[in-house]
Amino acid sequence: MHHHIIQSRSFHSSACGTRAVTPAVRTLQVVAACALLVVAGTSAFAQDPTRAPQATPPTGRGGTQGPQFVSPEVSTDQHISFRIFAPQAQAVRLMASDIPGNAQNNQLTKAENGVWELTIGPIDPGAYRYNFNVDGVATIDPRNPAISESNNNVWSLVNVPGSDLFDTKDVPHGAVAAVTYKSTALDRFRRMHVYTPPGYEAGRERYPVFYLLHGAGDNDDAWTSVGCAGFILDNLIAAKKARPMIVVMPAGHTSRGPNSPIGRTAAEEFVKDFVTDVMPYIEKHYRVLTDRANTAIAGLSMGGGQTLNVAFPHLDRFAYIGVYSSGLLGAFPNAAPAGRGGAPAATPPPNPPPTAAEWEQANAASLDNAALKKGLKLLWFSTGTDDRLIETTRATVELFKKHGFAPVFVESPGGHTWINWRNYLSEFAPQLFQTTKAGTQN
């Protein structure tokens, strides 16, 4: 039993360009918008944040309410103006930790017409999440239809154009599907996003498959919203820098409960769901090549740890492995600061992840198998030098070298941010499947 929604990215504005709104996303938008109506007293719907201001803003159910304005507004000199109508509010802050320069908790200024405003910049080209905090209540921007889900929240998105990686270009575009499937491993329905390359719907060709995993703070929406994965692939494929491929972005969290996302139970549940349900679903419902040479996996932060936990017990199925801002999470107690995504805290959490020695022992059959090593075409790591997990990555790379692997390790500038993760995807994807022919299996 499955529910499969194919989405053309030509309907609704997004920070990375255009994408459709899924039923799940639409529900989240409605909930967030209703919260804002209570705070701001307006029901005006959003305008495209990448366009110039319109003469007359759209009307809500009660007609045009409040002053006419646009938010966010990106100027040609790469400044961003954020605005919100909240005439009764005492304080409004911008929550946008992803924006360089730390825009977290920036105070907006209130005008006589009840519109609060803040301009920041110049900001480097990119897609950025933000919310408003209105008298202690977090809310999305009601004038902006572009949103991005996280694991426990919904964010507004703003795009500062000028990125060669993911700006919308006049090239053939693929499609993104939101797919709901029944997980037999977890006995519940789950969702994943699937990118298919330009021409997939009209053709019969089979494609390589790339499984791309998100981090602890996100869900399966993240790579296609703030991560801009579809547009990055569109542009790489159009430039003949990457092979056309199907990209599968599953949900990384198996529970919203208290379990650590890198703890043993959560890790085991994810691997079981991935191998038992996600991969078989994709191989049944999509025209993918299923041999090892045409299968890749990568992930960021928590997803990087999950990548290693999936790939090495099943190394006969993956020829390309990518780890972004991550490693064997929690395996090296002195390698990273305590906290989510880092090493265990001073008081170990319940159900801690395996130590490095335990992980090596559990995966000895793959780590010391010469034939499996030979079939692994790429083991690729990249982490920013300011990233809190840089020492975890370095220790993980050394572990694989000790077992005779030849990992590629790129230390980039920057930290634990989407700015880096989009770059890592754009560097990793062109290295995939270049030795295999389209539509064939080795």
Segments (PLM) and residue ranges:
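N-terminal secretory signal peptides that target proteins for export/translocation
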Residues: 1-26
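N-terminal export/targeting leaders of redox proteins
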Residues: 4, 43-45
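N-terminal start and proteolytic maturation junction detector
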Residues: 12, 36, 57-58
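Bacterial N-terminal signal peptides
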Residues: 27-43
